[in-house]
Amino acid sequence: MVGRMLSSPEPTLSTMAMSAAHGEDSPYFAGWRAYDEDPYDPITNPQGVIQMGLAENQVSFDLLEEYMREHPEASDCGAGVRENALFQDYHGLKSFRKAMASFMETIRGGKARFDPDRVVLTAGATAANELLTFILADPGDALLVPTPYYPGFDRDLRWRTGVNIVPVSCDSAAGFQVTAGALRAAYDEAVAAGTRVRGVLITNPSNPLGTTAARGVLEGILDFVARHDMHLISDEIYSGSVFAAPDLVSVAELVDERRRARGGAADAEDIARRVHVVYSLSKDLGLPGFRVGVVYSYNDAVVAAARRMSSFTLVSSQTQRTLAAMLSDAAFAAAYVRSNRDRLRERHARAVAGLRRAGVACLRGANAGLFVWVDMRRLLGDGEATVAGELRLWRRVVAEAKLNISPGSSCHCREPGWFRVCFANMSLETLDVALHRLGCFIKKWEQEQHEN
């Protein structure tokens, strides 16, 4: 009897549960596993893997800790435990939605306005992007996404929704900026294959490039989606992490400008209804564990649908009340944004200087984010300028230099040899160790080339 039970087939699961569309086999996630199995610690494991594949902001966490020490009432349930424990509005507490709208305005220098009634809260940007994909597209439809793009989009946009991603190929010759020709080519190819394209998703500032989109590029994308009856999702989760010129131009700013310039004309309102902004506190505030994301739409029907669907991705009332108190303190919010930008600028400069000493070039014009897009194409060698060659190099970096960096192919970059290197999720001392290791690895590689 026992033997028969042990030899019986496994119970079947759903197609979604067994699908490979999650993307967990990507080198992006494989690098995380290498770190998890052998994590670096300066005392207990100094030869371990240093995690440079995680875009996490730890450079300003002391400012948040200081605020909490000075304002313990912000996180103390106290007499408010009943209010926190009972049911609240699914799409977010009014006080927190108001605080989030104000903070989103602050980090954009007041150049865009956000209505708290259009703020829908989600458990992070992952949930926000998936929720919008569910709302805007049906299974089998597609979104255009410029490359290179955040590897998690393969999971966030495709896995549970059944929606496809059509990459918009951008190249280094244009600084990986989105061009009208690239958008048109991707769209035409998808339509020719019988795919209905429902929208364009961009990240601004870009992950993994660490650059902001030019105003003209954004204007062109707005006109493109209007011309082809599509939507635009602008993922702006790094909007408060712009540390150098040029300043961020948010798509929300352009919507406001067009409305003012055209006095509520039908074409300006038509474009506004196609625009949806995603934001999160995971990057700018460094609070990924709090799971706070935002869907902001100028489309009433999208806001209504997002509110209905947000019941699957709620933010706890305690989290909302704590952050509402913090972000409602306008003086603190403004001071934090300034200090965080200064610190990211210094950290970015240190990372770039160390990479250059190691013989690694970085993408020019980078001015935002928690990472550097680095050019290691010269390390691929003759005949190795392929995805396979890039992955062989990546495996060596992980195994020999004990550094987890993200290969460009995991970001769907069509030019092998580019990598994303994160710099804000570790101490300065650990960053220096990582850069030294990379320099030693490259010297070893150069020695091998000389000997061959």
From Swiss-Prot:
Family to which the UniProt record says this protein belongs: Belongs to the class-I pyridoxal-phosphate-dependent aminotransferase family.
EC class (word): lyase
Keyword S-adenosyl-L-methionine: yes
Record function comment: Catalyzes the formation of 1-aminocyclopropane-1-carboxylate, a direct precursor of ethylene in higher plants.
Record-linked PANTHER family: 1-AMINOCYCLOPROPANE-1-CARBOXYLATE SYNTHASE 3 (PTHR43795:SF45), BIFUNCTIONAL ASPARTATE AMINOTRANSFERASE AND GLUTAMATE/ASPARTATE-PREPHENATE AMINOTRANSFERASE-RELATED (PTHR43795)
Gene: ACS3
BP GO terms, sorted: amino acid metabolic process; ethylene biosynthetic process
InterPro entries, A to Z: Aminotransferase_I/II_large, Ethylene_sulfur-biosynth, NHTrfase_class1_PyrdxlP-BS, PyrdxlP-dep_Trfase, PyrdxlP-dep_Trfase_major, PyrdxlP-dep_Trfase_small
EC number(s) reported in the record: 4.4.1.14
Superkingdom of the source species: Eukaryota
GO MF term list: lyase activity; pyridoxal phosphate binding; transaminase activity
Catalytic activity: S-adenosyl-L-methionine = 1-aminocyclopropane-1-carboxylate + S-methyl-5'-thioadenosine + H(+)
Name listed for the protein in its UniProt record: 1-aminocyclopropane-1-carboxylate synthase 3
UniProt cross-references to CDD domains, sorted A to Z: AAT_like
Cofactor dependence: pyridoxal 5'-phosphate
